[in-house]
């Protein structure tokens, strides 16, 4: 993929308490954890088009920290298709990322290296989104990444 992160000026943000998605489904008193994420001007000014919700959102949806699954703070949670655009990067470099929710916390750190990132979650994507592939305007020489947790 041949890129380097040139901006090391991140602000660390923390949220407590963090329990995770399964907390409400187990009959146990689990000690709270803390969720941490990095941000900067590039991340704060990136636009995220959510195809499922048909709207532009922010990379970090901080209001979602109060949801049952506060991990949804990253790119508004599980969704089939997102297009992230970085107005500060005029390289034209693009990334297509096939992913699960694990990648939602990684993708923000890749934004500064790309003009556009297309994120496809194969668990949720339907043919109605894939039929619109030409609308994504993905370049033929775009980088492609597959990232899944185990």
Task: Give each language-model segment a name.
Residues 1-150:
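Extracellular glycan-modifying ectodomains
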């Amino acid at each position: 993929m041949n890129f380097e992160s040139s901006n090391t000026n991140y602000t660390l943000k923390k949220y407590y308490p963090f329990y995770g998605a399964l907390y409400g489904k187990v009959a146990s008193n689990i000690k709270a954890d803390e969720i941490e994420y990095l941000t900067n001007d590039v991340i704060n000014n990136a636009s995220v088009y959510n195809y499922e919700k048909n709207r532009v959102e922010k990379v970090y949806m901080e209001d979602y920290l109060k949801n049952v699954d506060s991990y949804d703070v990253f790119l508004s949670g599980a969704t089939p298709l997102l297009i992230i655009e970085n107005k500060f990067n005029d390289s034209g470099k693009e990334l297509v990322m096939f992913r699960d929710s694990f990648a939602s916390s990684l993708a923000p750190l890749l934004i500064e290296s790309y003009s556009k990132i297309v994120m496809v979650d194969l668990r949720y994507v339907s043919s109605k989104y894939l039929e619109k592939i030409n609308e994504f305007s993905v370049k033929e020489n775009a980088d492609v990444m597959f990232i899944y947790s185990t």
